[in-house]
Amino acid sequence: MESQSILPPPPPPEDASAPPPPPEESAAPPPPPDVSAPPPPPEDLPPPPPEPEVKKKKVGWGTKRPATTPLSVEELVRKKREADAAAARPKFMSKAERERLALEKRAKEVDAQRRRTNGTPNGVDGMDLDTPSRGFRTPNGDSRSIPTGPRAMRNGDGPTPTGPAAMRSRNDSGTTKSDKKVDKRFNEEDEAAAQAALIKQRYMGADQTSNFSAKKKRKRTTDRKFNFEWNAEEDTSGDYNPLYQHRHEANFFGRGRLAGFGDDVADSVAKKYAKALEDRDREAGSIRAREILEMERRRREESTRNQLDKHWSEKKLEHMRERDWRIFKEDFNIATKGGSVPNPMRSWDESGLPKRLLELVDRVGYKEPTPIQRAAIPIAMQSRDLIGVAVTGSGKTAAFLLPLLCYIAELPRIDEFEWRKNDGPYAIVLAPTRELAQQIEIEAKKFTEPLGFNVVSIVGGHSFEEQAYSLRNGAEIIIATPGRLVDCIERRMLVLSQCCYVIMDEADRMIDLGFEEPVNKILDALPVTNEKPDTEEAEDSSAMSRHLGSKDRYRQTMMYTATMPTAVERIARKYLRRPAIVTIGSAGEAVDTVEQRVEMIAGEDKRKKRLGEILSSGDFRPPIIVFVNIKRNCDAIAREIKQWGFSSVTLHGSKTQEQREAALASVRNGSTDVLVATDLAGRGIDVPDVSLVINFNMATSIESYTHRIGRTGRAGKSGVAITFLGNEDADVMYDLKQMLIKSPISRVPEELRKHEAAQSKPTRGAGKKIEEASGFAGKGGW
């Protein structure tokens, strides 16, 4: 073994012209030529003399390597061209050689199959005992097996070494360090991609894209399924069986019938059965037949009563069910709270009002009740205390006037005895402004004069002597503002000894104007003998109506408002007993019939120019109302409007009562085109057929804005409200944007939507504006 390891390799064969044998398929391909290795010596030269043995030098990373001479480009191109030409030439192989190669290949396949099937004697699968042992190699490439020959000849199936061992690849396992680096880089990239996918799913949610495709061809699973159903034309039983040709009809006793048939079939069956009874027995059978037909008629009516496909407007009142009432309330946006609240009325005939009062309603022209009238009148007719929350212009005046007239109609006439005149009215109606009080008086006289009742209004701007003269004959109903009514009580012009009906209209506006203390004084002046108990008995309509026709009837209190601030709730808790709460829509919202438009215009001159363009466009017919915030601006804008060729009047707190009434009368009768006013005209003033409301200055609060635009679109008619907005209105921009969003027919302009002040609700009390006018007493007020 020692001698074999030092022998040089055998010399090449002498016959260089003979073709080399074909390479075996199982042999590994030769390695690429090593460009750093020196070329082999030519064959015709004699072998070089043996070189003296030189001691090996230590090779390391710091050792300087000898410079190698690179090959020329022309030499490489020439070699490549020769190799390509040799590969392109066909190689001739004899038949015997081809058969030999085929037999060798087949023998190797059989041998490999035999080794895989039977295994080796030692139990090691896949090892050839005839070949030299390859041994086990560590990751560093070192062999741990027993050497069987020279290092250069251990791997017999490998290529012959062509250079020093230090310049050859030691990794024989097929995986190089560069491959390991590539795999490691790919693993790191896969891990980074997986982490990025998890982060994307965490913050952006799972992928909602569906991979479903309707065009994708699906495998049909019912092709070979046997069909157990037969078509009608495949039935052959009727050809030979007479039973199928003459089918027997099932006859039921009495009203029995097959399911799935309509009432017409049941009616015909009942008539047929009744006729059979009459034919069998003329006397008793005819009576029984009539009873059966009557039973069938009642059954048909009962089924019609419980039908769900009929609308509530097509049903009778006794046929209405809880589901129908729920749909009815949703249609009119009615919400009620409180115990024992009656159902709304669908028409005036179901209101429970006296016949004489219904005739007056028809004469005045109230065809269909409004939502607040549908819900509030049945509750008020049961002597219940009531809080009505409804949008402006919804018919609240008639909602409390009609039950009031029905209430006092049961009481003795006030002019029957002299002492009754001196005990004061039966009912008082409180309103925040003089104009609203006079408007309620006009509406009330439409019903009270035919019934013989006396109505008197007590408001500021008129002398006390004139109002005392109006009260000389007594009055069943007094309509007043809180301030003037307190003055009359303190001057002993009026007492409330027999007052049993109290109505507060626009209660939230009265609180805003500082009338909370006068309202408390008025309510404290009422008698306590007829006050309702604060128990469940206050919800019992029969108990509250027990003393009909006498003086001792329980007091009934009603409050109507558009919003519910804290002060209004405080008054309601103190003076109302177990009230029923009726809400139409949402508190504080504008009516859906008003189209709200907002224009961002800064500066008085630009707003005046835009106002002139709107009035001159001819798109809106008079009357038109223009609202401003400051009283001195009313006259200036009115002069501008007159210069444009339109007639105009002003309405504000510096006007006398006669001037206010004359201005409203000129607008109502059509002699004036434009009314320029402050918030004095923004609450409760009813000017018919107002087509346009212009807010020259935005209101200081969203509640005032709501009642300003409520002057148009009243009684179900449509209207338009245009508001000029500036940066000084930042406190109300957020609420204004929310109101425009809720309106189905309005649009939020982009300037308002993107404005900084409209993004969040302002803090309470920050930048709150103070209204200039502060009351209604004399010229100093509105």
Curated annotation (Swiss-Prot):
Location of the Helicase C-terminal domain? 593-756
Q: Which UniProt keywords apply?
A: ATP-binding, Cytoplasm, Helicase, Hydrolase, mRNA processing, mRNA splicing, Nucleotide-binding, Nucleus
Q: Per the record, which residues fall in region Disordered? A: 1-192, 751-782
Which stretch carries the motif Q motif?
A: 346-374
GO MF terms, alphabetically ordered: ATP binding; ATP hydrolysis activity; mRNA binding; RNA helicase activity
Q: Name one GO cellular component term.
A: catalytic step 2 spliceosome
State the reactions this protein catalyses.
ATP + H2O = ADP + phosphate + H(+)
| The organism's place on the tree of life at top rank | Eukaryota
Q: Which residues bind ATP?
A: 390-397
Q: Write down the EC number.
A: 3.6.4.13
Location of the protein in the cell: Cytoplasm; Nucleus
How does it associate, per the subunit comment? Component of the U5 snRNP complex.
Record function comment:
ATP-dependent RNA helicase involved in mRNA splicing. May destabilize the U1/5'-splice site duplex to permit an effective competition for the 5'-splice site by the U6 snRNA, resulting in the switch between U1 and U6 at the 5'-splice site. May also act to unwind the U4/U6 base-pairing interaction in the U4/U6/U5 snRNP, facilitating the first covalent step of splicing.
What name does the UniProt record give this protein? Pre-mRNA-splicing ATP-dependent RNA helicase prp28
